[in-house]
């Protein structure tokens, strides 16, 4: 007789109703009773196994501390809070106790919290005895909790683990200080977009090490690479950056949900004023590249130089050219924007004459930001963050200012200590002193496309790159940044084309 499987205490009646007519009633009752006993034992075993598995998941979930690498800007903090709610909702639907979810920008007023290491002591003190993992992710990382638990279960939580999706340089690059020049592929570092995890034994070890070897005053340039400079990264294939709807995402515990944030209609061309820093010696080789590539995307653009040349045209700001730093020139641009440009222009972008940029994509991105807030946006670097330093936007990838940010900056009287001071770092110091946070966007790039891992760029729609050295800048622009690509290809096709380059 086929045996009916079911849950709860209601299985016996349907089973008995399905019994066929038997010639020996006593025997039939005996057989049915034996059948019932077997099924009860099986059901009890199944329920016990299910309950045990459920309790195990509950315990495992409580042992993970989720840390979202969030930012205080209103757009980014909202996205981080949305992710926090998603994590808690998944846990609630599983019927489990809610895990701890931390947002980095809420954890520490210290400007270096985003570099993670300054938080190791707090992680160790707060969670070193009652947790097994610290799981880090970005605001656009999407997590499937059950699959994440299944993935972490493969690793002995009593050992030191550094887990993530592995990236590597294909050739040595300036942004990583030409590290591992003989074979840069041997060094693996995590892609933050896929999420990454530290076991508590490793967190405790790092916290103890930082007690005896305090963080030095130094530059933070590429955090994910510098975080990989220590215990070896163990690649985890379930930590993914595939799109949520990709067929590849079936096996993934994490995915990445956004390539280029868009929050409505792109801002108008006339709402962005672009200032190009140049000098006479580059009028003939760099400015023509700008005119062949992105200049036509901008409605308002001016070239600022040490020499006025009407054919371009350039504007002499009366600040002598310097071989480095350019702080005097940058602050003169800020003054000019505030005092001479239309008061209705809400955004200023300052770029170098060898910056390649997509104004079309920038217009989309800026739809997510409120120009009435003091916004200072670009690729974030840091200096001396372990010892009370500051963050700054690196100038080569482009610096984006809201008018409100410039007004607050100039009203503060913070200024250059010399014309050749590093403008981006001085701006970082000034905004830090004002309590205005730097807003990081990884779509801005200080270096060339070839200086970044292919897998890292594959989940981006980049906004800028920098430097013409050893490349064909016009070709690179039309490969990576030209607006016609949005009309001609889907994001997936773009990525496939880039992989073939």
Which ranges hold each PLM region?
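Secretory-pathway lumenal glyco-enzymes, predominantly type II signal-anchor Golgi glycosyltransferases
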Residues: 2-501
């Amino acid at each position: 007789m086929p045996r009916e499987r079911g849950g709860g205490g209601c299985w016996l009646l349907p089973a008995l109703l399905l019994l066929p007519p038997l010639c020996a009633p006593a025997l039939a009752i005996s057989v049915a009773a034996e059948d019932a006993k077997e099924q009860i034992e099986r059901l009890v075993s199944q329920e016990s196994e299910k309950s045990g598995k459920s309790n195990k998941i509950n315990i495992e979930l409580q042992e993970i501390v989720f840390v979202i690498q969030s930012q205080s800007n209103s757009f980014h903090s909202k996205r981080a809070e949305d992710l926090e709610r998603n994590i808690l909702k998944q846990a609630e639907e599983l019927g489990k106790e809610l895990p701890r979810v931390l947002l980095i920008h809420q954890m520490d007023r210290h400007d270096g919290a985003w570099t993670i290491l300054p938080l190791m002591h707090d992680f160790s003190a707060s969670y070193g005895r009652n947790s097994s993992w610290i799981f880090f992710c970005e605001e656009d990382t999407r997590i499937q909790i059950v699959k994440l638990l299944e993935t972490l279960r493969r690793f002995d939580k009593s050992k030191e683990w550094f887990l993530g999706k592995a990236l590597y340089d294909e050739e040595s690059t300036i942004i990583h200080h030409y590290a591992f020049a003989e074979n840069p592929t041997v060094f693996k570092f995590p892609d933050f977009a896929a999420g990454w995890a530290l076991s508590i034994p490793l967190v405790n070890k790092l916290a103890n090490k930082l007690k005896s070897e305090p963080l030095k005053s130094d530059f933070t340039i590429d955090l994910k690479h510098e975080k990989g400079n220590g215990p070896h990264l163990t690649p985890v294939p379930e930590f993914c950056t595939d799109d949520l709807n990709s067929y590849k995402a079936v096996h993934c515990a994490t995915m990445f949900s956004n390539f280029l944030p868009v929050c409505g209609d792109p801002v108008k061309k006339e709402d962005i004023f672009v200032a190009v820093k140049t000098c006479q010696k580059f009028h003939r080789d760099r400015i023509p590249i700008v005119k062949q590539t992105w200049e036509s995307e901008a409605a308002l653009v001016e070239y600022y130089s040490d020499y006025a040349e009407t054919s371009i045209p350039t504007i002499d700001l009366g600040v002598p050219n310097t071989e480095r730093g350019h702080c005097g020139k940058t602050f003169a641009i800020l003054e000019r924007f505030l005092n001479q440009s239309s008061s209705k222009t809400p955004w200023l972008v300052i770029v170098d004459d060898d910056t390649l940029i997509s104004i079309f994509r920038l217009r989309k991105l800026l739809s997510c930001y409120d120009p009435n807030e003091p916004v200072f946006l670009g690729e974030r670097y840091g200096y001396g963050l372990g010892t009370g330093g500051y963050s700054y936007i690196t100038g080569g990838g482009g610096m984006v200012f809201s008018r409100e940010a410039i007004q607050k900056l100039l009203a503060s009287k913070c200024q250059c200590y010399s014309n050749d001071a590093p403008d981006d770092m001085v701006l970082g110091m000034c905004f830090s002193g004002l309590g205005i946070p730097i807003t990081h966007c990884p779509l801005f790039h200080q270096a060339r496309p070839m200086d970044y891992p292919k897998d890292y760029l594959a989940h981006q729609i980049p906004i800028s790159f920098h430097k013409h050295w050893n490349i064909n800048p016009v070709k690179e622009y039309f490969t990576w940044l030209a607006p016609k690509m949005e009309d001609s290809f889907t994001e997936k096709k773009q990525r496939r084309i880039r992989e073939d380059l």
